[in-house]
């Protein structure tokens, strides 16, 4: 697959500088935000640039944990669909503090795009406890035990959008468990689908309900493909079931994406 052509990015140096800085602020690299005290990547809470770039820690205060490389990937994908007029909205399923969606809205603002919506889908209660009947890999990860860090309220996410002056009518929230909200989500067409649900069930629910809405030429981004085995299982099974052969492209140690070609 050919590299993404950054058509829109090259048209306005002011917007490029704005987005360059926004990415650094969202990830907390510009002020070296330390890791959360319950950080999983190293034993202390010190800020480590190489870890933050790869999205391998939980920041104490920054508005995203996905790191610089995955934020840049969002920018590349969104600017590509803008530059090539790929129809559809933008969505992230599983938003934590909202940083990835804030970047999506910032990109639309930077390029004066007014006919696309950013959809913010999350339980706003953290990771579900799948129970004994749930997928074995989901039970093994037991991420609900980390909800003291992973659960972020809708009001906090809205406040984060507001602090960037980006909470407006082009941002819509879908609060609730994906199995309940996504089947009836009022989304017609998607240009970028970003999944960060971690679990098999969350990933499967997202693909089942939203992948058919992704335009040809649009992008599917999987945040935890190489970090969370159940997420990878769901993606691989869905792609096999529906004969999706589009190339999976690596973003960093954890994330992948593909461009829909048919």
Swiss-Prot record:
GO function terms (MF aspect): metal ion binding; methyltransferase activity
Question: Domain of life, per the record?
Answer: Bacteria
Cite a single GO BP annotation: methylation
Record has rRNA-binding as a keyword: no
EC number(s) on file: 2.1.1.285
Keywords, sorted A to Z:
Antibiotic biosynthesis, Magnesium, Metal-binding, Methyltransferase, S-adenosyl-L-methionine, Transferase
The residues annotated as the active site are 72
Q: Where does S-adenosyl-L-methionine bind?
A: 64-65, 92-96, 122-126, 178, 196-197, 202
Please list the cofactors this protein needs.
Mg(2+)
Q: In which pathway does it act?
A: Antibiotic biosynthesis; novobiocin biosynthesis
Carries keyword Methyltransferase? yes
Residues that bind Mg(2+): 196, 223-224
Q: Which reaction does it catalyse?
A: desmethyldescarbamoylnovobiocin + S-adenosyl-L-methionine = descarbamoylnovobiocin + S-adenosyl-L-homocysteine + H(+)
User: What is its quaternary makeup?
Assistant: Homodimer.
Its biological purpose is as follows:
S-adenosyl-L-methionine-dependent O-methyltransferase that methylates at 4-OH of the noviose moiety, the penultimate step in the novobiocin biosynthesis pathway. Novobiocin is an aminocoumarin family antibiotic that targets bacterial DNA gyrases.
The family classification in the record reads: Belongs to the methyltransferase TylF/MycF family.
Q: Can you name this protein?
A: Demethyldecarbamoylnovobiocin O-methyltransferase
Q: Which organism is it from?
A: Streptomyces niveus (Streptomyces spheroides)
